[in-house]
């Protein structure tokens, strides 16, 4: 099968045809229509790469973001859920783009990164306003999970942590808000 690469801004998206779940065109269309292009800055590629050695080291990992290269690699299709694996793959791509956006904040907007770190610490110290168990792992996963939830299920983030929702809306997405997730659609 020919490896198809689609460019979104300066980010190459490719290899997803091999997943059997989504095409590179579908992923690129989603990213183009949904994610602010500034969130792709410094991210050279988003690749479906199930044979990447990182996935041997992390047998349950769905994807990873490399903070040095800003590359995003998505893992084997069989690791995605049985009920809606296509949506889980899109959720995962969104989560990994969230890591890229967070890394760019750390590198260029320390005051916003510090606000996020403070929200994470407050959550960790008793407020328990995480959108998922995985979000409680560390401030990086909290940001990426909250980013994904802001885009994919904004009502959940607004319910769980109005402060994190407001920070995402005001500082990360420049006021852009997403429609609520429709029950039964995803």
Language-model region placement:
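Disordered inhibitory propeptide/activation segment of secreted metzincin zinc metalloprotease zymogens
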Residues: 1-5
């Amino acid at each position: 099968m020919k490896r198809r690469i689609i460019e979104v801004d300066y980010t190459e998206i490719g290899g997803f045809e091999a997943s059997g779940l989504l095409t590179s065109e579908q992923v690129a269309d989603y990213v183009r229509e949904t994610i602010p292009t500034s969130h792709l800055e410094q991210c050279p590629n988003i690749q479906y790469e199930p044979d990447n050695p990182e996935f041997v080291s992390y047998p349950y990992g769905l994807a990873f973001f490399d903070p040095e290269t800003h590359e995003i690699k998505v893992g084997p299709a069989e690791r995605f859920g049985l009920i809606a694996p296509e949506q889980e793959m899109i959720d995962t791509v969104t989560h990994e783009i969230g890591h890229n956006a967070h890394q760019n904040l750390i590198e260029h907007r320390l005051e916003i990164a510090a606000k996020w770190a403070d929200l994470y610490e407050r959550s960790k110290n008793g407020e328990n306003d995480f959108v998922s168990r995985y979000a409680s792992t560390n401030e990086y996963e909290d940001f990426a999970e909250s980013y994904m939830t802001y885009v994919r299920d904004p009502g959940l983030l607004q319910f769980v942590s109005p402060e994190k929702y407001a920070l995402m809306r005001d500082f990360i997405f420049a006021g852009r808000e997403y429609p609520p997730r429709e029950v039964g659609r995803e």
